[in-house]
């Protein structure tokens, strides 16, 4: 387990929370990323994502988008990942994430591409497209979101309205 979750709110064992977070990230496919910039104000967008064993989420975006401009100005970001509930008011399952995000370069780009292709095997199959993502030569780029803190709600597993908040600890 390359990262540990230190629970700051709630009363659930950390290893079970870790398992729940990993399960939810594996089951969901899209995140909502929230950014803010000095000129354009707050913004939210959707992106397909992949994640690695260090709780880093990777996504692809055009450099021309508002959120990409925001991340170039300010790395702080928030995201949500959730599964649709079966009915209104029942069985909420999701994560609220805060951390830092930005373009992935060098080894980070290699890790991003490996994670993304691991989840979406048809992504960037030709050598030229892979090279553009790894060198930053295209209109689109690989981005990384390093989760620093999370709030989890998983009513089927943790109970109704049991919000668990945790800090992500790496390199322990």
What label would you give each PLM region?
Residues 32-37, 86, 127-134:
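Short helix-to-loop capping/linker segments positioned immediately adjacent to catalytic or ligand/cofactor-binding
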Residues 5-32:
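Short, basic/aromatic recognition patches
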Residues 25-26, 72-73, 135:
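Alpha-helix boundary recognition
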Residues 1-15, 91-172:
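Charged, gly/pro-rich active-site loop segments
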Residues 29-30, 76, 121, 150:
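Generic structural signal for secondary-structure transition and capping sites
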Residues 28-63, 69-71, 78-83, 92-96:
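Short beta-strand segments
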Residues 65-67, 86, 158-160:
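Short, surface-exposed beta-strand-loop junctions and turns on beta-sheet-rich folds
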Residues 62-65, 78-84, 120-131:
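Short acidic (Asp/Glu) patches
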């Amino acid at each position: 387990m390359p990262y540990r979750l230190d629970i700051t709110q709630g009363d659930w064992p950390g290893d079970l929370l870790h398992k729940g977070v990993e399960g939810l990230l594996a089951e969901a496919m899209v995140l909502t990323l929230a950014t803010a910039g000095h000129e354009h104000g707050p913004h939210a967008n959707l992106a397909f994502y992949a994640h690695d064993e260090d709780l880093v989420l990777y996504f692809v975006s055009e450099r021309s988008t508002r959120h990409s401009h925001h991340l170039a100005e300010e790395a702080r970001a928030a995201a949500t990942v959730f599964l649709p509930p079966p009915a209104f008011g029942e069985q909420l399952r999701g994560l609220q994430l805060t951390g830092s995000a930005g373009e992935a370069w060098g080894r980070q780009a290699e890790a991003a591409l490996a994670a993304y292709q691991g989840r979406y095997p048809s992504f960037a199959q030709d050598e030229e497209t892979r090279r553009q993502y790894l060198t930053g030569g295209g209109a689109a780029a690989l981005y990384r979101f390093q989760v620093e803190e999370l709030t989890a709600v998983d009513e089927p597993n943790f109970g109704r309205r049991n919000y668990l908040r945790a800090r992500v600890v790496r390199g322990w």
